[in-house]
Amino acid sequence: MSKEFLPTILEQKEQEVEAMSYEELQPLRSTYSLYEYLKSQSQELQLIAEVKKASPSLGDINLAVDIVEQARTYERCGAAMISVLTDEIFFKGHLDYLREISSQVSIPTLNKDFIIDEKQIVRARNAGATIILLIVAALSEKRLQELYDFATGLGLEVLVETHNLAELETAHRIGARIIGVNNRNLVTFETDINTSLQLSAHFKDDRVYVSESAIFSKEDAEQVAPYFHAILVGTALMQAEDVAEKIKELKIDKG
């Protein structure tokens, strides 16, 4: 695979969407609002726990995992939400994983994928997602706004992912309430936790912010805790020998 990860992935997504049929809308799964929950739990750094079998940068992470049991452990140990990778080609995920997990937990679930079309959003909702991911770097601002409005119009929440100041300002302009700062550059897939620290100077009081990627330890979590409502962690949890203990380590009391 090319080192230009994002363009390669988006090219594949365009092919997938072209072959994708429109699904009839199914009822929205009932759970709490992630935005309201993160706002109300600001005294503790919250955890968005991810189910991820593989990635383009690391290759296979944990192919043997029981995805439902992993998700149940996340919920039992206090995760605010479960993120589920559904990309098949690059992350070895599947929409069925989202469907299975969403049917077995009561907390919000995020469809973690590269969404570029309304058809994907309907499929995500039908599979049990209550939140979808939109990546600023993957879309024009006009298209980002269209997909954001479409998703929220269906009762879904949206995690809008950014990586630099220009993208953060775009997320603010479209009215995003839940904003992620990805410490991973989606072109090179290199990570730097300083991305979160630098962008935190530009946050707005009425939004909630999630630091994503490059968080493996208590020390990493403590670095971002003063500025963020939550962290999104995948690899560290998927590789942990004791998932419950790892979650306990990453949940930081902000006083």
Swiss-Prot record:
EC annotation from Swiss-Prot or TrEMBL: 4.1.1.48
Any Pfam family the entry gives: IGPS
MF annotations from Gene Ontology: indole-3-glycerol-phosphate synthase activity; phosphoribosylanthranilate isomerase activity
Top-rank EC class of the record's enzyme: lyase
Domain of life: Bacteria
Gene3D superfamilies reported for this sequence: Aldolase class I (3.20.20.70)
Pathway info: Amino-acid biosynthesis; L-tryptophan biosynthesis; L-tryptophan from chorismate: step 4/5
Biological process according to GO: L-tryptophan biosynthetic process
Keyword field contains Cell membrane: no
Keywords: Amino-acid biosynthesis, Aromatic amino acid biosynthesis, Decarboxylase, Lyase, Tryptophan biosynthesis
InterPro entries: Aldolase_TIM (IPR013785), Indole-3-glycerol_P_synth (IPR045186), Indole-3-glycerol_P_synth_dom (IPR013798), Indole-3-GlycerolPSynthase_CS (IPR001468), RibuloseP-bd_barrel (IPR011060)
Keyword Cytoplasm: no
SUPFAM superfamilies the UniProt entry points to: Ribulose-phoshate binding barrel (SSF51366)
Catalytic activity: 1-(2-carboxyphenylamino)-1-deoxy-D-ribulose 5-phosphate + H(+) = (1S,2R)-1-C-(indol-3-yl)glycerol 3-phosphate + CO2 + H2O
Family (UniProt): Belongs to the TrpC family.
Identification of the protein by name: Indole-3-glycerol phosphate synthase
